[in-house]
Amino acid sequence: MTVPISILEKFKLLNYDKVLNNIDNPKGKNKIILDTDTANEIDDQFALAWTLLSEDKIDLIGVTAEPYSFQHHREELIQAYKIINDNEINNTNIELVNSYSSWVKGLVDSEIDPKNIYFDTPSEGQEKSYNEINKIFNLMDINTNNRVFRGSTEYLEDFDQPYMNESTDFIIQSCLNNLDEKIYVCAIGCLTNIASALLIEPKIIKNLVVVWTSGFPSYSPLNNKPSLNLVQDVKASQLVFSCGVSVVYLPGFNVGAQLTISLPEMNEFVKGRGKIGDYLYYLYTNNPLHKQRGVQDQLMKTWIIWDIINIAWMIEPSWVSTIVLDMPDLDDKLFWTQKKRKQPMREAVGIDRDSIFRDFYIKLDNLK
């Protein structure tokens, strides 16, 4: 279901110019909260490490743990695996098969039955992320100073029943205690914590700026189902794009997807750069998604470090080319649709991949 009018009426909408000001390119040093499903794969760890290495541009006031889970893939993956193995592909199932063909191929090549793959629950994902956040701080010998918070253990099921937890409370209090400043929440996973905070205290739309990476460009006709960040919690995604909060949208597909890194680069620029460099190298060479999907030929593959796009925009907006356009709605079928009421949104359309990684590598190199 899309967001009910009764829910949207709780939000006092900002005028057009106020939203434009909120989504303007960041200048100087800004307060951010990193909202992250850190243990999901490996890109969040890169994003958090780069954030902690960028104190000149980022005032990291908190890190909030998000839930994550791939459980929504299980039934379709098993079904596609059986169809392909039994050679029963036809016009009625070809779309499903195409969605999972590369995953199934990896499992077949690795002799893995999808029925034997364990997918973390959202609650387990949140707790693993919380622990992983603390691990990154420890590896970098940085005191958390009570800046790490547990988040929601489940996805938003009812707009009338948001989840109060450490993360939502921290987001709310950060906004209310700094009314004259923008509070950027760099969301690099699902939007559960942010949506719950908005539903609990709608007043925070005044100075909350949601910087989110996910999905296809808002002008794309493609379905957003492939986006993990979006599809895990559809209600939360719909709420953020409907309630009037200021949004900087950084599409993963086509834009963030350019942030690839290779094993030779990891060897040359990351490995040996302090405990965190060695850990990032370990993650790259022991990627949990490689194991989950039966990826074997890692040597000649790159990996996308999606989530550093948020941090790149906060550090140097020119590295992430953006335009201001009308914010869309997200329908129940996960397509972007035209919104009746005009609200501006900043959206990424291009990226300076080399400058982004150069900054990251230089800062890591100082840890040698």
Residue ranges: model-predicted function:
Residues T2-K368:
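N-terminal acidic, glycine/proline-rich low-complexity segments
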